[in-house]
Amino acid sequence: MDLSPREKDKLLIFTAGLLAERRLARGLKLNYPEAVALISAALLEGARDGRSVAELMHYGTTLLSREQVMEGVPEMIPDIQVEATFPDGTKLVTVHQPIA
């Protein structure tokens, strides 16, 4: 399998996001990399599903709450930016204050 660097990055985000989902399902609080991976993976998948940038910007704020992450993590993530592939091309999705 010959993947481009971009494809490798997306695969890494997906894998880390899947791990974060499993840990969250077991009742564990997520750390910084896990929280970023979970939100990023969800945004990439949402773009693949055909959601708009505006929908994803809102959706990204609904994925995690303060109770689901370790102390201090929400303050470490003021925003998340993901370059996602949409049916009409690649666009930058920015989610401000993703963990409320």
Curated annotation (Swiss-Prot):
Which Gene Ontology BP annotations are present?
urea catabolic process
Q: Name one GO cellular component term.
A: cytoplasm
Which stretches are transmembrane?
Answer: none
Class in the EC hierarchy, top level: hydrolase
Reaction(s) the record says it catalyses: urea + 2 H2O + H(+) = hydrogencarbonate + 2 NH4(+)
**Subcellular localization:** Cytoplasm
Concerning Pfam families, the annotation shows:
Urease_gamma
Q: What is its EC number?
A: 3.5.1.5
Q: How does it assemble?
A: Heterotrimer of UreA (gamma), UreB (beta) and UreC (alpha) subunits. Three heterotrimers associate to form the active enzyme.
The protein in question is named: Urease subunit gamma
Gene encoding this chain? Answer: ureA
